[in-house]
Amino acid sequence: MYKRQVRINPTGSVTVFTGSHSHGQGHETVFAQIVHEKLGVAFDSIDVVHGDTGRVPFGVGTVGSRSLAVGGPALMRSIDKIIDKGKKIAAHLLDASYDEITFKDGEFSVSNSNKFIAFSDVVGAAYVPGNYPIETLEPGLEETSFYDPPNLTYPAGAHICEIEIDPETGQIDIVNYCVSDDFGIVMNPMIVEGCLLYTSDAADEE
């Protein structure tokens, strides 16, 4: 089970608190990618906090390739909650009903009209509640979500190693090494390729 906390700061920057600690796998990059793609905020305005037990939420660590498969949905749930609250704020600001509001590319817009408001303006309204539905919504934009998968995931893959063995000395030399893995949805191809090459290079270690 993983917990993700997402905080939209008054400046419009985003802070993600995660209990899954990166050991070089690129969690910070991929989690920031998810926030960027879902909210449309600038990539360099997203800060991912991990490894600080005084600040981060509950998490079981990065084991069994679970950080994205399990932590990713928890992060997306928190973002969806923020978008949902943002739609309520936008509906108030645009004098529309909640059902009329859609969110895309960093903007809340009213269906079948040219009325819209930027995500940054909704954030500002959330923290300066002068024109805000204070009776029904608490100020601020910060959400937390848990995700516990209903079952385990098992990736499929095959590794084939061709070796030569010196019959006199017993010396083993790797001639060729082929890897085939099913990764599912790849968020960042460069990171996946790097992890794959690193694990393959480990075969040459002594």
What are these regions (language model features)?
Residues I46:
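Short conserved active-site loop signatures built around small residues
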Residues M1-Y2, Y198-E206:
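Single conserved hydrophobic/aromatic residue that forms the stacking wall/gate
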Residues L39-F43:
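Phosphate-handling active-site elements
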Residues K3-T15, G19-K38, G51-L197:
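Cofactor-centric catalytic regions
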